[in-house]
Amino acid sequence: MIRIKNLSVPYDETRTPTELAAERLGVSPCAVHGVIVVHKALDARRRNGAPIRWNYTLDVTADGTRGILTRLRRDAQVGRAEEHGPLRVPPYTPQEGRERPVVVGFGPAGIFAAWLLARAGAAPLVLERGQDVDRRTRDVAQFWRTGRLDPASNVQFGEGGAGTFSDGKLTARSRDPRMNEIIEAFVAAGAPEEIRYLQKPHIGTDVLRTVVKRLREKIIEMGGEVRFGTQVTDITMRAGRIAALTVNGAERIPARAVFLGIGHSARDTYAMLHGAGVHMEAKPFAVGVRIEHPQDFVDRMQYGAAAGSPFLPTADYALTFRDEEGGRGVYSFCMCPGGLVVAAASEEGHLVTNGMSNYRRDAGTANSALLVQVTPTDFGGAVLGGIDFQRALERRAFSAGGGDYRAPVQAVGDFLSGRTGTKDFVVVPTYMPGVRPAALGTILPDACSASLARALRHWEQRVPGFGAADVPLTGVEARSSAPCRILRDAVTMQSVSAAGLYPIGEGAGYAGGIMSAALDGMKAALAFLERIQ
């Protein structure tokens, strides 16, 4: 098979990959028998007037492969395609007296730890404090409609984790070949095939709900068991290793291998683990607000005159700013093209935002978190101090919104000048169950507000309209990542203080996003399987 790299074509190119490959290789399309799109990325930088283009990597099956490779041997962009074999999964051999492994949490890390363990024949038991995705979707919809929060079933807790109510982005920095196993599992469960090759793949919250349900069904089919409404409320240790779990304050489950994928919002579980002697540390995170624009503004910002073309995807953006005066980084995060701002609280009397898009990204509005870095020195460095810091922000936001889960909202111009009252926004804030004008600067810490203000002024200079006076800001965004890290050995992936306990994913402080969390869960499961061989 031949690999063609860096095949660049206009964004509105209508020829098929087969025709493009044939032209690049100098053969007739009839000589090409198969083309796999390995990678497809949009170059919309438009530097020095350059047009927008798609860049492809293609794997091609063609007549006369040897001759083609010989003829093009000096062409650095054409060569023989690499081939990767399937992931080797060490088999699990049940032994008398050996408890089956337990997975705590059914977000991306927990799902793929359980998926790999089940594939190996280990028949894992999954314990998820929240509800299955169908019930969870109903509970969340009721919260958004009425303001009645279920602390056990919400945007943070339940099947699929917090990512179920997000944009479903599958971007990752890692080039680990095991990522392909995750992508293929998603596709087999109903995700669009384009996630195999797009540079910025996403599933969308609407499709993701079906995908996570099918992954659960596959785990059960392979011998696993999944229990919902089952919260781990205590752990038992013996001689420095995990021995058992207590669920819902009553049932005791013997366990000598526990994969801890609790998510970044399991604050009560963090406290329980810390009290039980599991070693943890405070870590940096970030807090801020959500900003919203009309999607066509973002499309014009990125595509210029080509905005609106059916050949181009809904545009996104990524912005960063180093606030030298305040000594903090400020950046956009979890940008949701064609999406909505959603209520993501998991505790009564607390308010937190998040962003969400469907697969088609057709809501007409774009939103992104704008976050300011926070370090342990901002909250005294205590292990659980970051949780207290987050809670204080969320309580202030809840109060500022009126105490009924409406979110505080403020126009950029008012935020920068310290006023409130503007109601004529460039786009109607999408947060449900609604918004209320408030001073976001009184909710965020002074240092964070100052850094955010300087970032908004900087971005408005770079991208006129981004920080315009009538652009709405909705707060508060406080759950971008875990506020602490559960310490683990770099090789065995077990807790440094509790043998047999495998902290995994975003909640353990070792991942950020669906793909990195899923990979972390897989790696921990592989480490366990290799250890017991």
What residue ranges belong to the model's regions?
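Residues forming the flavin
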Residues: 1-52, 58-189, 193-533
